[in-house]
Amino acid sequence: MKVLLIGGGAREHAIAMALKKNELVELYTLMKNKNPGIYALSEEVSFNSETDVPAIKEFAEKIKPEIAVIGPESPLGVGASDLLEEMGIPTVGPKKLPAQIETSKEFMRNLFKKYEIDGSLKYAAFNDYGTELEGFIDEMTSLGKDVVVKPAGLTGGKGVKVVGEQLKDNEEAKIYAKEVFDKSIGGGKIIIEEKLVGVEFTLHGFVDGENIVFMPAVQDHPHAYNNDEGPITGGMGSYSCPNHGLPFLSEEMLDKAEKIMEKTVNSINLEVGPYKGFLYGQFMLTADGPKIIEYNARFGDPEAMNLLPILKTDFLDVCFAIAEGKLDKINIEFENKATVCKYVVPNGYPIDPVRNKELAVDEKAIEDANAILFYASINEENGKLYITGSRSAAVVGISENIEEAEKIAQKAIENFKGEVYYRSDIGTLDLIKKRVERVKKLAK
């Protein structure tokens, strides 16, 4: 069974591992760098940019896969899924138009408005900097609301800036908005949104164009340093619970979040056609219930590393069910176990990360700790590993409870040597308790 995988990060390493649990799978991967974890699992690798559509076509024509799985968002944005489907290859990953739920923040917000989907917030879109943009921010200030500045296109999760975090106040938000236009960050179009106050969580679904099957809820930790301090990153780690909920998330709130995602899928279908792939909703649990911050048209990273290792159902079967519109024909189950994922990242990340420095990894010690190792932005050359400037590698602990899973992950992450750092508090009971207390305060 030939499977084409596009992507070379930790998320794709998790996808590759999950696929290879089926002994019939022969994996063929197109990726930019030599990720040693994915490389070891692949029959053949094409080293090309994941947005190089001609290279994707050439590799697919050569290997003739029976199914394709697209990991990152960038190939979706250039129509890789459209191309593969046109070639007659069943593909997991939405086509270019449905993928706009991630690639165009304006499309997403307008969809919520048009179809009256719950969980939306006050926003406005702008094509240039001027009095209208300034007036909208001034209006938010008069309402006592801080704002979030979001370049409308893809920025690899690095373009969004929030008042109270990267920005001092709404006046500084205006300065950053002007910079986005001056430098054409994310395509030179902007969404200004009200800043939500609450606790974040993520919810994933397998989507086959009509049906959505939900995965366990996960909490990511975007801040660089312990105690949720420092700049926003792509995610320093995450955890999930044995009951597939989260300690601060009631069943009622989880149900509301699921209904928002269900209506989103139906609305995408009506607007631009069927959505087939993984859908990841980033939510904020506020005093008014769950609000959607943004959607991603793929697995979250790090969340994929929490979810895929505890998937009991054959992942290849799930992928075919997604591509063929048959999710209602299979039973998808996850183990009732806790997971804790911790990332090791280059010193200086995400502002000014060191690059091309050697990273020593004691794989045996990580295995002895009963953790799973996932390689991310790593390049292997002459048997040595080098960090490339983004998140380097992650470890995942799995156990009957959060406390034990965290201990496994923590023991494992101490086995990296190089110019790197990590957060030691992810999955700890102290940090989780703070989340619970914060939600209690919101309810008052």
From Swiss-Prot:
<dbReference type="GO" id="GO:0004637">
    <property type="term" value="F:phosphoribosylamine-glycine ligase activity"/>
</dbReference>
<protein>
    <recommendedName>
        <fullName>Phosphoribosylamine--glycine ligase</fullName>
        <ecNumber>6.3.4.13</ecNumber>
    </recommendedName>
</protein>
<dbReference type="Pfam" id="PF02844">
    <property type="entry name" value="GARS_N"/>
</dbReference>
<dbReference type="InterPro" id="IPR016185">
    <property type="entry name" value="PreATP-grasp_dom_sf"/>
</dbReference>
<dbReference type="InterPro" id="IPR020559">
    <property type="entry name" value="PRibGlycinamide_synth_CS"/>
</dbReference>
<comment type="pathway">
    <text>Purine metabolism; IMP biosynthesis via de novo pathway; N(1)-(5-phospho-D-ribosyl)glycinamide from 5-phospho-alpha-D-ribose 1-diphosphate: step 2/2.</text>
</comment>
<feature type="domain" description="ATP-grasp">
    <location>
        <begin position="109"/>
        <end position="324"/>
    </location>
</feature>
<dbReference type="Pfam" id="PF02843">
    <property type="entry name" value="GARS_C"/>
</dbReference>
<keyword id="KW-0464">Manganese</keyword>
<keyword id="KW-0658">Purine biosynthesis</keyword>
<dbReference type="InterPro" id="IPR020560">
    <property type="entry name" value="PRibGlycinamide_synth_C-dom"/>
</dbReference>
<keyword id="KW-0067">ATP-binding</keyword>
<feature type="binding site">
    <location>
        <position position="294"/>
    </location>
    <ligand>
        <name>Mg(2+) 2</name>
    </ligand>
</feature>
<dbReference type="InterPro" id="IPR037123">
    <property type="entry name" value="PRibGlycinamide_synth_C_sf"/>
</dbReference>
<dbReference type="InterPro" id="IPR013815">
    <property type="entry name" value="ATP_grasp_subdomain_1"/>
</dbReference>
<dbReference type="InterPro" id="IPR011761">
    <property type="entry name" value="ATP-grasp"/>
</dbReference>
<dbReference type="GO" id="GO:0009113">
    <property type="term" value="P:purine nucleobase biosynthetic process"/>
</dbReference>
<feature type="binding site">
    <location>
        <position position="294"/>
    </location>
    <ligand>
        <name>Mg(2+) 1</name>
    </ligand>
</feature>
<feature type="binding site">
    <location>
        <position position="294"/>
    </location>
    <ligand>
        <name>Mn(2+) 1</name>
    </ligand>
</feature>
<dbReference type="InterPro" id="IPR020562">
    <property type="entry name" value="PRibGlycinamide_synth_N"/>
</dbReference>
<feature type="binding site">
    <location>
        <position position="296"/>
    </location>
    <ligand>
        <name>Mg(2+) 2</name>
    </ligand>
</feature>
<keyword id="KW-0436">Ligase</keyword>
<keyword id="KW-0547">Nucleotide-binding</keyword>
<dbReference type="InterPro" id="IPR020561">
    <property type="entry name" value="PRibGlycinamid_synth_ATP-grasp"/>
</dbReference>
<dbReference type="Pfam" id="PF01071">
    <property type="entry name" value="GARS_A"/>
</dbReference>
<dbReference type="GO" id="GO:0006189">
    <property type="term" value="P:'de novo' IMP biosynthetic process"/>
</dbReference>
<dbReference type="InterPro" id="IPR011054">
    <property type="entry name" value="Rudment_hybrid_motif"/>
</dbReference>
<keyword id="KW-0479">Metal-binding</keyword>
<dbReference type="GO" id="GO:0005524">
    <property type="term" value="F:ATP binding"/>
</dbReference>
<feature type="binding site">
    <location>
        <begin position="140"/>
        <end position="202"/>
    </location>
    <ligand>
        <name>ATP</name>
    </ligand>
</feature>
<keyword id="KW-0460">Magnesium</keyword>
<dbReference type="GO" id="GO:0046872">
    <property type="term" value="F:metal ion binding"/>
</dbReference>
<dbReference type="InterPro" id="IPR000115">
    <property type="entry name" value="PRibGlycinamide_synth"/>
</dbReference>
<feature type="binding site">
    <location>
        <position position="282"/>
    </location>
    <ligand>
        <name>Mn(2+) 1</name>
    </ligand>
</feature>
<comment type="similarity">
    <text>Belongs to the GARS family.</text>
</comment>
<feature type="binding site">
    <location>
        <position position="282"/>
    </location>
    <ligand>
        <name>Mg(2+) 1</name>
    </ligand>
</feature>
<feature type="binding site">
    <location>
        <position position="294"/>
    </location>
    <ligand>
        <name>Mn(2+) 2</name>
    </ligand>
</feature>
<feature type="binding site">
    <location>
        <position position="296"/>
    </location>
    <ligand>
        <name>Mn(2+) 2</name>
    </ligand>
</feature>
